Structures are given as structure tokens and as C-alpha cells.
Amino acid sequence: MKTVNVCDFFSSPIGLGHVTRDIAIVKNIKNISINFVTGSGAAEILRKLDYKIDDVYNPPSFIVENGILNNQTKWLWNYFQYYKNCKKISEKIIKINNSDLIISDEDFASLTVAQNLKIPNILITDVLETKFTKGIASFIERKMNKSM
């Protein structure tokens, strides 16, 4: 079994729940260099706690009113573009850091890259399928769900 020395920990920057649980997890990991990859408010929290971070993710904004996502098709398109961009970003970081392990808290782009590069990876999630959209956009969303 290969020893893990370097771990890139990709934490979704959407909301603060991901980074909160990720900090609790990292506090229990010893003798491994951890580099967080995230953005937005999550990056600010990690920076204040003196974690090593790459603040590189800028997710699309979204508006929810009465439990309904506004502009669903537009948001889905923006999220798909964000995902493609995150794949490029995560591949660059993983290769530069020569990572031995990838931990992904709902960052599916880094997970895909890790699997393509045959790097051991761990997914942290509480979502098995999204249901943000209705109508024609839901067909695209279902296809994206299958790719996760």
C-alpha cells in the first residue's frame, strides 16, 4: 500500500456546510500535507484558520424563492460551464501538487479528474441526485446526475 503524503481536499464553495464538516474531518488527519481547494466564503473561513488553500472556485449564483430555483435552465447551463472550468482547475492543481489522495466534498469535477488519473479518491456527500429543475431542463439535469 502506498503512503499518502499529499492530499488535495476539494470542498464545494456553495454554502458553508461543506467546509464546516471538512474542517472537522481534517482535524483528525495526521502526518499528511492537506491543501484545500475551494472559493467564496469557504475560502475565507479556511484562510482565517491558517489552512493552506487554493481560492480558485467561483460558483454561479442562484436565487431560490418559495423553494423554487429561479431561471432553472440558465442556472443549469452556468453550472455546467462552472463544472467544466473546475475540471481544468482541479487537474492543474492535482498535477502541480503531485497529490497522493483526493478528497472531494461534493466537488464532482475533482473526483472525475482523480479517477481519470487513477489517484485514490474519497467522495463526501449527502446528495445522491439533484432535483433543482423542471421541464426541459430536468432532462439535462438527469443526464448530469448520471455522470456523477
Residues covered by each model-derived region:
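A short, Lys/Arg-enriched amphipathic alpha-helix followed by its capping loop at the start of a domain
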Residues: 25-33, 45-46
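Short, hydrophobic beta-strand segments that form beta-sheet elements in well-ordered domains
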Residues: 33-38, 101-104
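Conserved nucleotide-sugar donor-binding subdomain of glycosyltransferases
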Residues: 71-101, 108-109
